Amino acid sequence: MDERLLSGESAYEDADLEYSLRPQTLRQYIGQDKAKHNLEVFIEAAKMREETLDHVLLYGPPGLGKTTLANIIANEMGVNVRTTSGPAIERPGDLAAVLTALQPGDVLFIDEIHRLHRSIEEVLYPAMEDFCLDIVIGKGPSARSVRLDLPPFTLVGATTRAGALSAPLRDRFGVLSRLEYYTVDQLSAIVERTAEVFEVEIDSLAALEIARRARGTPRIANRLLRRVRDFAQVRGNGTVTMEITQMALELLQVDKLGLDHIDHKLLLGIIEKFRGGPVGLETVSATIGEESHTIEDVYEPYLLQIGFLQRTPRGRIVTPLAYEHFGMEIPKV
């Protein structure tokens, strides 16, 4: 997959920045009002009862703040957070090592939880339900099962593919929160806050322009601001103005709706080769040279969100809105 400026996936250079920008409390957290308000109630109720918070599943497109919310949950509960990911847990023993190291009340955050192997999920079930761990000792006829008690803990799982979770695992989460794309106003506030951290002056109109092209995603908004800041320092006087912002984003090939060359390639491929569709996912994959799951999980969600693409039983269809965006005539049926 191409390295994309507009990818919601975390890149190496994002890690330190996101840590420094990360809000510590729900009050500081911008956006996701529905999920935030529900979590406020659930956390306060758990603290009043002096219990651990129910297990939480956070799902939605990448870059919307799932990792940030997991850390905030731990902060609000006044406990530590232990972070791992589905791909990092290769064997049941790996999960057992993580679980037995937890302290009472701790938050265990598993990113990409949909990538856990089914055999590891089965170890997780009793840990989530009964706070215990069943371990098989020995092999063959002499093998025996030993049950270890675990301290009460909260599992926070994050996924971009909630549908890929097995039903037994999904059903063990007491709190399910879908994170939605951010509004332009919310992203503009995030851009201005990030500019303060960077100690960079930014015009409010420039912040809005970056927000409009950030695909509803804070991670992308912050990444665009970093690149525009570079242009402001080299081609301007250091202030991020509307003029500098528009010039920078044009040179970076980010159009007014936040579409880049890969989005154009996908949409125009369907329009020019298949008369706008319907066309199957595998055919689209072969046409643009990207894996089907990458198209489905990374490229399509935003195009669906803005109404440029439709998924139908017969395949993908490019909508009239996309034709208008490209200044193309809609083909007659």
Swiss-Prot record:
Pfam family, one: RuvB_N
Reactions the enzyme catalyzes: ATP + H2O = ADP + phosphate + H(+)
Region (Small ATPAse domain (RuvB-S)) residue spans: 183-253
GO MF annotations, alphabetized: ATP binding; ATP hydrolysis activity; four-way junction DNA binding; four-way junction helicase activity
CDD domains, per the entry: AAA (cd00009)
Cellular component, GO, one term: cytoplasm
Positions bound to Mg(2+): T67
Localization (cell): Cytoplasm
Keyword DNA damage attached: yes
Large ATPase domain (RuvB-L): annotated span: 1-182
Organism superkingdom: Bacteria
Top enzyme category: hydrolase
Positions of the UniProt region annotated as Head domain (RuvB-H): 256-333
GO BP annotations, alphabetical order: DNA recombination; DNA repair
Residues engaged in binding ATP: L21, R22, G63, K66, T67, T68, E129, D130, F131, R172, Y182, R219
Keyword annotations of the record: ATP-binding, Cytoplasm, DNA damage, DNA recombination, DNA repair, DNA-binding, Hydrolase, Nucleotide-binding
Enzyme Commission designation: 3.6.4.-
Function: The RuvA-RuvB-RuvC complex processes Holliday junction (HJ) DNA during genetic recombination and DNA repair, while the RuvA-RuvB complex plays an important role in the rescue of blocked DNA replication forks via replication fork reversal (RFR). RuvA specifically binds to HJ cruciform DNA, conferring on it an open structure. The RuvB hexamer acts as an ATP-dependent pump, pulling dsDNA into and through the RuvAB complex. RuvB forms 2 homohexamers on either side of HJ DNA bound by 1 or 2 RuvA tetramers; 4 subunits per hexamer contact DNA at a time.
Subunit structure: Homohexamer. Forms an RuvA(8)-RuvB(12)-Holliday junction (HJ) complex. HJ DNA is sandwiched between 2 RuvA tetramers; dsDNA enters through RuvA and exits via RuvB. An RuvB hexamer assembles on each DNA strand where it exits the tetramer. Each RuvB hexamer is contacted by two RuvA subunits (via domain III) on 2 adjacent RuvB subunits; this complex drives branch migration. In the full resolvosome a probable DNA-RuvA(4)-RuvB(12)-RuvC(2) complex forms which resolves the HJ.
Domain remarks in the Swiss-Prot or TrEMBL record: Has 3 domains, the large (RuvB-L) and small ATPase (RuvB-S) domains and the C-terminal head (RuvB-H) domain. The head domain binds DNA, while the ATPase domains jointly bind ATP, ADP or are empty depending on the state of the subunit in the translocation cycle. During a single DNA translocation step the structure of each domain remains the same, but their relative positions change.
Entry's family note: Belongs to the RuvB family.
Name of the featured protein: Holliday junction branch migration complex subunit RuvB
Gene name tied to this protein: ruvB
